[in-house]
């Protein structure tokens, strides 16, 4: 199953839509205003996740004390072999339903943890060229993959979530996790943008690089699904390249106008001063 998590607004507020086969499934919102407070207190602001009618399904609660204690010792994981960062509790209609956090087990060994329904799913993030991937595991079995193109226009990120049908029940949590992931890793809070584009190539190296299987989507969903994803990614890159060329032309035109104005001003001043 393919689920798309598309950021629809990045100015003044961060809004997302979660859809599948053209049907809106959920909406989400993340904090926008950039605030720097002691002990990361700005993270006390909630991420929200709602159904199409706007009814809240989940919110987050920043585990302030737990994070303060856990993160107070730099490189604690070198001694304890495990240290949690960015712990957010998932709050549902019936109270706490799980948590999101990063587990650091070594200098080159980190993973995202998704606690829900009494289980812990692990997400391994990897930059490889023009895309970022998060491979989601249930134990030793891969159950999902999140693909994010690193070409972004106007800070509007998009994520493609492929998930095995037997895990469809956790689509809401994984979709909400994707918004949390964006907030933790690709957050552009406080930035006002228009007609901008970012085109990146990036590679990350770590102990868990082998968790990414480039053939997983084709194996689980068929070659057509893999080809369709590649087409979507190529389209995004093409749109980004076109936008970049447009921006270059506009900047060049602006400089040309400034040069012409400077020449005119010089001629006027010269004639005036004799």
Language model segments and positions:
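Low-complexity or membrane-interfacial segments used for flexible interactions
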Residues: 1-46, 82-87, 98-99, 104-271
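A glycine-rich, hydrophobic loop/mini-helix early in the fold
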Residues: 44-93
């Amino acid at each position: 199953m393919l689920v798309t998590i598309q950021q629809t607004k990045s100015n003044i507020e961060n809004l997302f839509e979660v859809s599948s086969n053209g049907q809106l499934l959920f909406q989400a919102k993340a904090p926008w205003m950039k605030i720097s407070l002691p002990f990361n207190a700005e993270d006390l602001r909630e991420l929200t996740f709602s159904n199409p009618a706007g009814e809240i399904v989940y919110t987050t609660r920043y585990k302030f004390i737990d994070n303060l204690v856990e993160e107070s010792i730099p490189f604690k994981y070198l001694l304890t072999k495990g240290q949690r960062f960015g712990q957010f509790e998932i709050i549902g209609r019936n109270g706490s339903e799980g948590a999101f956090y990063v587990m650091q087990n070594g200098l080159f060994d980190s993973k995202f943890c998704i606690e829900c329904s009494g289980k812990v799913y692990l997400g391994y993030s990897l930059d490889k060229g023009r895309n970022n991937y998060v491979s989601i595991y249930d134990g030793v079995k891969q159950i999902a993959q999140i693909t994010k193109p690193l070409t972004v226009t106007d800070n509007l990120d998009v994520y493609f979530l492929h998930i095995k049908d037997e895990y469809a029940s956790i689509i809401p949590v994984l979709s909400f996790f994707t918004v949390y992931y964006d907030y933790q890793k690709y957050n552009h809070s406080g930035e006002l943008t228009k007609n901008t584009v970012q085109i990146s190539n990036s590679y990350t190296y770590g102990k868990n690089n082998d968790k990414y299987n480039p053939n997983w989507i084709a194996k689980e969903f068929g070659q057509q699904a893999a080809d369709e994803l590649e087409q979507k990614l190529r389209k995004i890159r093409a749109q980004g390249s076109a936008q970049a060329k447009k921006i270059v032309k506009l900047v060049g035109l602006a400089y040309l106008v400034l040069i012409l104005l400077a020449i005119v001003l010089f001629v006027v001043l010269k004639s005036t001063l004799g």
